[in-house]
């Protein structure tokens, strides 16, 4: 088979996988809207209560699951290229913790209860600060994979310590907000909160279109510059985009870990690392994973609803350990 035929075959495989993932997402979305404490049949007319349940509760929650999953997966894929580390992930590297810490600071320092817009801005600033710290240390100190993970874990522990301190100075309402962020949950998502989504979606689409630029960056800064990439400008734009996505995701659903690690890594293993296809596929796969996880979170127990962050950690942590062992064996 000639080179152009191989390339055409690979592109056809990417597109077929993208269509399959989209179909799976649509099926899971339909299932998501039907199942719950009250089953909504697609073959019968809905009562006024069922219609309100569908439109005001399940539909905004479904949209939240999809946009958060897509944002985290695409952020993880981009961060892995930016840091040159396949184990990079917003939750593991402490960036999500930085976003939650900034939201806690806003919660306690502002004289009134912050609006979703204020929480979103605080989360974006927190994510940006922690991303800059991590990228700056990685570049200045030439950190290895293990050391970069340790720095990320340390940043996460630091932010977690401050958030834990906040427990002891919070009233009942603030305590519920803190628990919501720490465990990761979209149970409180409503259309009012989707102002955050209006900010997130354009950035997500823009980042998904940066695949060719990321492919050039993977060749190294020198080769990327020779191919016409303004490396410095592109790097800062990517950092800002990642911070906005992570900040919005944390503001909407709290800290949800491992989506940005597991999804891009498994897709790279299965289909290769061509980012112009990997990024859109990561978005659909991340959305699919979070919708699937939230279905289980809502239905696994009869008496209670599990936090979404617990479900993604249960799925992602064993895969992360396997990836660490595999990375060690490769070296």
UniProtKB/Swiss-Prot annotation:
UniProt keywords, alphabetically: Cell inner membrane, Cell membrane, Membrane, Transmembrane, Transmembrane helix, Transport
InterPro entries for this protein: ABC_BtuC-like (IPR037294), ABC_transptr_BtuC (IPR023691), ABC_transptr_permease_BtuC (IPR000522)
GO process annotations (BP): cobalamin transport
SUPFAM superfamilies xref list: ABC transporter involved in vitamin B12 uptake, BtuC
GO MF annotation: an example: vitamin transmembrane transporter activity
GO cellular component, one term: plasma membrane
Topological category with respect to the lipid bilayer: Multi-pass membrane protein
Family designation: Belongs to the binding-protein-dependent transport system permease family. FecCD subfamily.
Function: Part of the ABC transporter complex BtuCDF involved in vitamin B12 import. Involved in the translocation of the substrate across the membrane.
NCBIfam families xref list: PRK03784.1 (NF003001)
Assembly description: The complex is composed of two ATP-binding proteins (BtuD), two transmembrane proteins (BtuC) and a solute-binding protein (BtuF).
The protein's name in its UniProt record: Vitamin B12 import system permease protein BtuC
Organism, as annotated: Vibrio vulnificus (strain CMCP6)
Gene name for this UniProt entry: btuC
């Amino acid at each position: 088979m000639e080179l152009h035929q191989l390339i055409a075959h690979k592109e056809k495989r990417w597109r077929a996988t993208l269509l399959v993932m989209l179909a799976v997402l649509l099926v899971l979305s339909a299932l998501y809207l039907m199942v719950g404490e009250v089953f909504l049949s697609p073959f019968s007319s809905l009562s006024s209560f069922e219609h309100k349940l569908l439109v005001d509760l399940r539909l905004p929650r479904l949209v939240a699951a999809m946009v958060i999953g897509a944002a985290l997966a695409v952020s993880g894929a981009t961060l892995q290229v930016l840091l040159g580390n396949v184990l990079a992930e917003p939750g593991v590297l402490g960036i999500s913790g930085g976003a939650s810490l900034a939201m806690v600071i806003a919660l306690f320092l502002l004289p009134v209860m912050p609006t979703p817009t204020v929480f979103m801005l605080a989360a974006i600033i927190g994510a940006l600060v922690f991303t800059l710290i991590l990228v700056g240390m990685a570049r200045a100190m030439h950190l290895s994979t293990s050391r970069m993970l340790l720095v990320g874990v340390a940043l996460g522990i630091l932010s977690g310590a401050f958030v834990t301190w906040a427990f002891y100075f919070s009233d009942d309402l603030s305590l519920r907000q803190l628990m919501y962020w720490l465990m990761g949950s979209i149970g409180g998502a409503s259309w009012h909160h989707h102002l955050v989504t209006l900010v997130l979606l354009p950035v997500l689409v823009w980042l998904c279109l940066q695949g060719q630029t990321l492919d050039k960056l993977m060749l190294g800064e020198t080769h990327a510059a020779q191919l016409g990439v303004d490396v410095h400008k592109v790097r800062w734009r990517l950092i800002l985009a990642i911070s906005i996505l992570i900040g919005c995701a944390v503001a909407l659903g709290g800290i949800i870990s491992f989506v940005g690690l597991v999804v891009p890594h498994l897709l790279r293993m299965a289909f290769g690392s061509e980012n112009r296809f990997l990024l859109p596929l990561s978005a659909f796969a991340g959305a699919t994973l979070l919708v699937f996880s939230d279905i289980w979170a809502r239905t696994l127990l009869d008496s209670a609803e599990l936090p979404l962050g617990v479900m993604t950690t249960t799925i992602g942590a064993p895969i992360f350990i396997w990836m660490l062992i595999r990375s060690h064996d490769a070296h």
